[in-house]
Amino acid sequence: VRVVAILVARSGGDHLATTIAALAKQTRPVDVLIAVDNGSRGSARSQLEDARPAHILSTGGAVPLGEAVDMAARVVAASPTVDDCLWILGQDSAPQPTALEHLVGALEVSRSAVVVGPKQYDAQSFEAGSPGTILEFGQSLSPRGQTIPLVENELDQGQYDTMSDVLAVGANGMLVRESAWRTLGGFDTGLPVVDDALDFCVRVRLSGSLVQVVPAAVVMTHGDGVTALPRVERERDRRREFRQIRRAELYRRMVYARALAPLLIWLSLVPWAVVRLFGQMLAKRPGLVGGELSAALSVAFSLGSIGRSRARLRGQRRVSWASLSGVRLAATEVRRRRTLSREAARIRLHGEKRSLYFFAGGGAWTIVALSVISFAVLFPLVGATSIAGGALLPAGHSLAEMWSLVGYGWRPGSAGLIGPADPFTLILALLGSLTWWQPSFVLVVIWFVAIPLSGLGAWMLTARLTERFVIRAFAALSVGVAPTLLIALSDGRPGAVLTHIALPWLFLAGFRAARSWSASATTALLFAFVTACSPSLAPALLVVWVGSVLLTGRYVPRFLAIPIPAAILFGPLILTQLSLLNPLALLADPGPTVASPTTPAWQVVLGFPTPGLGGWLDVSSVAPLGLNIAAGIVVLAAVGVIAVLAIVGLFSPHPIRAQLALLVMLLGLVTAVGVSNIRFAFDGSVPTPAWSGSGLSLAWLALVIAATTGISVLRRFSVYPAMVGMLAVVVLAVPLTASFFIGRSVVVPGNDLVFPAYVSAQAAMNPDIRTIVLTAQPDGGVSASLERGLGPTLASSSTLVSTTSSASPALSVFGDIAGNLVSTSGSDGNNELRAMGVGFILLTSPQAETSGEITVEARDADARASAALFANPALQEVGVTSSGLLWRVPDVDSSVVAGLEPPALTEPLRSIIISTQALVLFLTVLLALPTGALAEARPRREIPGLEEDFEDFAPVDALGGDDDEPQN
């Protein structure tokens, strides 16, 4: 046997030098050495010359391994008397001294063996005298044609020394008879990177010859990527590797298929890639989505190469595919291997799961206590099927109506306005679907679960940072009965309530976003949820996001993707408001615009979005001496306790955590003070700012997290500052918890009726009928809105309507009609009302100022409007109702409304917007679903100060030196 060693090099250096030295030490020397300079860089050429090969060939650029070996094989003159063998080596293939001797011996013993392969050791972890790590030792195929390494990353303890016949071996160190190489045509040029050796070995087996592994032969490899895929570390390289592997798999599937199967496979390439795309998202591998499509398209357009490969395989095959069944893996074996691999990876990456001690540590009792508080505070609402008051309206009159308002279309409340819906409309539609039989009932549920659910989020969030049960209880109570939440509940602010509930869960998911695609996607969904409920928080949260991206270190794609769902949801509204030159309107609160009294900035900074220091000034006003100063001192002391605990956190063993929390608190305060002084929307003619409570919810949560760090300073004695902190929170909450009993809350049980019963009854039979709602304004004007059917709802509210100050042609016409109705000198408007499908005119009570007072101008305007309506001969008086004075327009044909607002005018933009948003949200939800998929890699760095030791929601000693047993 004459052995021709073919050494292929792409770069010089230590690896190539080691390989050349190893060749010189072989106990069975090579007969001919041919070096191939495969587009090398650096000193490779001179190193190859120093090896004194028989020939040095240059490819002129990087070419596939098979082509480089072919070039070298053609140089060798075939001998009729000597059996030539080709030994394929790369620059990083350092064979052990006896490797070639054992490989040649295997070929000499078995004349039917054409290809033999060695064990491939990991050169980086190998130490002389110690067992090596087997990177590869034989290959096989699954029933579906996937490449399965028989041995991969296992310590060599002799457990595979009896292996012999296999389906295939890797190219690294492969020894192949030159005659077989020439007859079979070498490696398939259609597989330039992956599975070239496997495909060649399959053709060897189908030609009737054998492929064997030689356990005694060992070849080292550094993973340079010359004879196999390179060792990858970066995510970009992993994506490229997956694309190459997937392409090779699909290519071989097309080549190996029989009869009409190739046509069916070709037709299904792209559709199946789309299906697998969703599977990759569900498996938390979004980086592989592009590789799925790219691989499928590449194979779909490689029909010429596939045809040549199939023809060659037909000409070379001498035995049936069934003859390979003994060396292919059965489906049960494939499943067993994958199960073991996943379990090993899970233990390696995640470690042992630890309990949260949710029940043993008092977490359950804390949530039960908050639930009792919630039930007691909201007792007047027990039994309600809907609630009303403040910014509360029915969530929607029907689930179908709510979903019809999502995305883009005609905006209710205005005449002839087409535009994008607020993202909050989608939130309401999703929530309303939970109580589909009565969508508004979900608001009652939200009101009752707000306190315990936000407290649970804070408990879980704090559990990421400390094992101290009392600190977790402090955080849960502080967030659960926060002044901002209690005020939002009593003032009827659904967006603010939902924001307060979601914020702890947002930061909880955000802490794990760098480690898990599932957590990243959950963070993205919660980010979109919070910004949809409170757009005014978007700037602050974006600052937090940018800081996270900058601090997280090497691996940032998971953080970079967080704002994408929110951007998709807000995109149409952003473009519309920018086109109207009204960018600040993007920060307006969704839902009905409700004016509220101006709150002094110092009270906002103390954490109260409404005047009165959370009810303490009201409490002091009933005292004999009106102790306002004493009330202020009590509130200042209570807030001061939490602030002092937060400041102490700056001097704890983990000051960075407190520093970051206090920075977030400042962002929340700046947001709260800023939005309370800028008028974004209009309540009638009254400019109205966004509610400052959402910013204060963010500030309060951050302050509580900083305070938990301060409490932990005393370690096992932390129960004392925690109890003081809880007492301070209770002091702040006491007056607010009584608001539902003493008449300070505007939220009351509702009946889902917005309009008078007479109008609602008519609208139930004729949903297209319209109602003009007139309201006298504090400045003496009269506002008019055009409502359809049963009246406005939370879902039908639109910031595009409430923030628009310019009039469209249709709105100008409607304004003229409304002006004539409230003017005694105007026309009766009978024809115009009929043309618009208006069946009712409702004059509501005059609009009060933010102080709650009704101006003289508003009363005069109301009197003038009612006089004009009474005097209008085209209207029939219905009378006084619970909503105001009502008139009826007789003989109205409401079918004209469908012609005034044809759905066709909203297409195709509506379909495009809804489809895009649905696709992005669907993919994000797939990523967020907890399927148990393992992360491909972990980031090198965490956000400073927010370190944690476990992947799952486990108690973590992140307090530095807090090593004793968890205790209260």
Where are these regions (language model features)?
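Extracytoplasmic
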Residues: 591, 731-968
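Conserved donor NDP-sugar-binding/catalytic core segment of glycosyltransferases
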Residues: 97-141
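Short, acidic, metal-binding catalytic loop of nucleotide-sugar glycosyltransferases
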Residues: 21-30
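Membrane-helix boundary/interfacial segments in multi-pass membrane proteins
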Residues: 389-398, 412, 416, 485-497, ...
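Periplasmic/ER-lumenal interhelical loops and adjacent helix-loop junctions
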Residues: 408-411, 563, 567-653, 753-754, ...
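Active-site lumenal/periplasmic loops and adjacent helix-entry segments of GT-C-fold
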Residues: 379-504, 509
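Active-site-adjacent helix/loop segment of glycosyltransferases
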Residues: 206-301
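Membrane-embedded helix bundles of polyisoprenyl
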Residues: 218, 451-464, 470-553, 558-576, ...
